[in-house]
Amino acid sequence: MGFTTSSVTDAIAALDERSKEIFRRIVEGYLENGEPLGSRNLSRLLPMSLSPASVRNVMSDLEELGLIYSPHISAGRLPTQIGLRFFVDAFMQVGDLSAEDRATIDRQVRGSNRDQPMESVMTEASRMLSGISRGAGLVITSKNDPVLKHVEFIRLEPTKALAVLVGDHDQVENRIIELPAGITSSQLTEAANFLNAHMTGQTLPDLRRQLLTLKESVRHELDTLSHELVERGIAVWSGGEDEGKPTQLIVRGHANLLTEVGGAEDLDRLRLLFDDLEKKDSLIEILNLAESGPGVRIFIGSENKLFSLSGSSLIVAPYRDDDDRIIGAVGVIGPTRLNYARIVPMVDYTAQLFSRMSRPGL
């Protein structure tokens, strides 16, 4: 039977307390052990007195709404994807992390930051998230475009120059750039002066967009060769087609996902998930998902088109630099029976920790 989203939402809102309690017990049983729950066991668990026959009637109503289903004839019930989403939105209580949990995350992640490259910090964070989640922990870092402070072109030979860019936190990037044929030293200076006049407080993508709106001004202020040099400089600094795309993904805990494999079909889904994680477009999509709303985002099964074929859930949160720009994401990928209530605050806190670590002096 097909339902529209609004009709299901209206019907769910009209559920009585008895139906909600039975539904909640079915989902909690699934999240705890992955097993279907039958009417006889449910009748023993409920705080109110209900016969197995009465429980079966309620389960039938819940099944008609699309919230639960029977995996086998005469078996108990499991939540559907719609049911899991309803549970997460309506029943799940996400509390604050305990002081002990926060201290553990600080020790494992921030502690690994002592004189360690960022890759080591990312690895430790993804390992920590994997350890608490029964899933795979992931950390993505994207290219962080610095706010520009100063630029200079230094000729190395007739056809090449060193393009030096200084960011607002005094980070320096040096790139070798091919020079337009016939360009003079004065034209190198002219191009650098133009960039310095227009770049203050902007990132390279900002400057590239601004140049599109300043075509007439550029044409009047710069000759053809200087203009070409400006465009080449921006292109080489911003990485051309890779601008703004993630540069690194760390995933730990693949073995956790193998524990959920129940047969060849599950193994095929897992292969699809691993294949998806290898694709650069997938990393971009994860970052886009993290940016699509405030705080932690939860995607269950086919709600997330990226991992819909593998039937996986994704819990993800962005982290930011000191200018509040999103520069990466942390999260967990795993089976739909993740411990959402525990994982969500941990992903949230880890993202906040990465944000603080990404800021100078913290």
From Swiss-Prot:
Alphabetical GO biological process terms: negative regulation of DNA-templated transcription
One protein family per Pfam: HrcA
Family listed: Belongs to the HrcA family.
Keywords from the named record: Repressor, Stress response, Transcription, Transcription regulation
Domain of life according to the entry: Bacteria
Protein name: Heat-inducible transcription repressor HrcA
Gene: hrcA
Stated role: Negative regulator of class I heat shock genes (grpE-dnaK-dnaJ and groELS operons). Prevents heat-shock induction of these operons.
